[in-house]
Amino acid sequence: IYGMGKSAGNAPIELVAMHLNDCFGKDYHISQILEAIDANIMDFYKPATWGYNMFFFIAALNNCHPNYVSDLMNKRTLSVKAINQILGKLEGDKKLLYDKNYLENLYLEYQNVDVDDTADMAELTEAFAGRNVLLLGPGMNVEKQKDRIESYVKENDPIIVSINFVSELFKPDYIFLSNAKRYVQLATELLQKGDEFKVIATSNVTKTSGKFDYTLKYATLLDEDAEIIDNSFIMLLKVMIRLGVK
């Protein structure tokens, strides 16, 4: 994929697949190949780039203005499949005449999957009642503050909730998932360690098979006044407030 190999000149599988789809009536799922590129190659591609830019490939694949692709990728909340599905909703002249507000409405419409979370909220409220809670975000700060966190855990015996990642230093009781892109990256680990914790997902994240332990309505957790209305940490704080956590 992406022209990788032991030497230069390898044909990118995704470009071959697109050509076969367009010219020979094949039905290869290119989004799955792009997902593999995004999840496994982009981290080491950026310091030493080669070949074509996936960003422009996605724009060409959807015949749309490249700024649409840039805006969606910069959100860092969407899988490549989701990006292609949103771009597929662009209509008429809007495809090539960039309209940021139009795209934002399509994004929110796509993310806003409606669910009834009454039962799940009731069960979580009971589980969190009277308990201290420790929220862990991704990044280096958890490791830097390891001693302080260990001390807090020892003294308070909190429920530990990891936000869009699985902590290796502190065993979480729950994983809060609001980011579809992170879910794609974590899917294998969640499958392997599924018995060690429960997953609380927002309704914009779709499980590959079956259901998450808890699914909460995405729209009710948005912060309409914030620059990033679906910030994962803010969404989880709203969940904690609804659960009565103090």
Language-model features: locations:
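Gly/Ser/Thr-rich beta-alpha loop segments that engage phosphate groups in nucleotides
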Residues: 5-7, 11, 139-141, 166
